[in-house]
Amino acid sequence: MAKKNVVAMLLAGGEGKRLGALTKHTAKPAVAFGGKYRIIDFPLSNCTNSGIDTVGVLTQYEPLELNRYLGIGSAWDLDRRNGGLTILPPYQAQNGKNWYEGTANAIYRNMSYINQYDPDYVLVLSGDHIYKMDYEKMIEEHRQGGADVTISVREVPWEEAPRFGILNTDEDLRINEFEEKPENPKSNLASMGIYVFNWDVLKRHLIQDAGDAESSFDFGKNIIPNMLYENLNIRAYKFKGYWKDVGTIQSLWEANMDLLEADPEFDLYEPSWKVHSVNPNQQPQYIGNNASIETSIINEGCHIEGEINHSVLFYGVDVAEGSLVKDSVIFPNVKIGKDVTIHRAILADGVVVEDGATIGTPNGEVFVIEANSVIPKNEVVKEAIQ
């Protein structure tokens, strides 16, 4: 294989328990987002737009749908003879272990994949965040700063800080303290789960970590703290753009609603930074004579006869006459009958809502209806169907 300056490793095996029914039968990175996309489209598109053409995607939990979606990477221009996109599922190791035991272990068990390209840098990414980033700028700052490791960071609300790896830096952005998901955080500067490593440094630490019986084999809990203990040059790269961890029902719904702002912070329509996805090859959408649509995203193949207000509809959605869909996210191939009312809900793929049913309330919690559920005629859904 020809040498590659950068190899990206995309961690896409997450179960996503906090997404409930949405990840019951599929990996979190394959969850639908934004009327057209899957969550994994965003880091993959970032790689393409950043000129990174060698990406290993590490899958594990419920990988069938994700693997089928990724294919050979052609949607992201990653179908290459040298490099491109490679799916890296767990395999039976010599010690008899099958599953990846942590984020660091997943990379460790695929060192041979990385070694064949003899890279200078390894970019480690998470497959479950919504954002646009030019990774090349981060890599260049890493290179110019003489860093061993660079971690992309941003400030988060204090109440959310315990969900993240939290760090402190000096005035030159050198990281001097890192704590994974602290109960009482000292800072609100959070790791985004995006790392640039010098490959020789990372390789050495992965091998050391694999031999530690007490390790959790995790970047945040083990690798980064061990590197800090060795006083390596670990630097922060401050990211100021939109970034959303969509690991909960509420945050996923909010991120979809963010797209509907008059001047959205996260703009899907930016021509200079396209988000690539697999084309569903649907027919054009049809808007009926009595339909009403306001501040919404409507994808291909939709047939709308009712009222859509401040909502995101994926491809192949039917909404019959007299129905209202408001402040909701409707996944592909959902069929909504006549005189249905839906407020603040996420309906997963293939849901059928029969005539006269009511789902959700204008001011309540966000409801989730599991894929392929059938909501009977005139049913009033007061609890999420998961």
UniProtKB/Swiss-Prot annotation:
Binding site for alpha-D-glucose 1-phosphate: Y100, G165, E180, K181, S191
Gene Ontology terms: biological process: glycogen biosynthetic process
Chain segments annotated as coiled-coil in the UniProt record: none
Group of enzyme by EC: transferase
Catalytic activity: alpha-D-glucose 1-phosphate + ATP + H(+) = ADP-alpha-D-glucose + diphosphate
Keyword annotations from UniProtKB, A to Z: ATP-binding, Carbohydrate metabolism, Glycogen biosynthesis, Glycogen metabolism, Nucleotide-binding, Nucleotidyltransferase, Transferase
Gene Ontology molecular functions: ATP binding; glucose-1-phosphate adenylyltransferase activity
Alphabetical list of InterPro entries matching this protein: ADP-Glc_PPase, ADP_Glu_pyroP_CS, GlgC_bac, GlmU/GlgC-like_hexapep, NTP_transferase_dom, Nucleotide-diphossugar_trans, Trimer_LpxA-like_sf
Top-rank taxon: Bacteria
Protein role: Involved in the biosynthesis of ADP-glucose, a building block required for the elongation reactions to produce glycogen. Catalyzes the reaction between ATP and alpha-D-glucose 1-phosphate (G1P) to produce pyrophosphate and ADP-Glc.
HAMAP family: GlgC (MF_00624)
Complexes and interactors: Homotetramer.
Family the entry assigns: Belongs to the bacterial/plant glucose-1-phosphate adenylyltransferase family.
Official protein name in the record: Glucose-1-phosphate adenylyltransferase
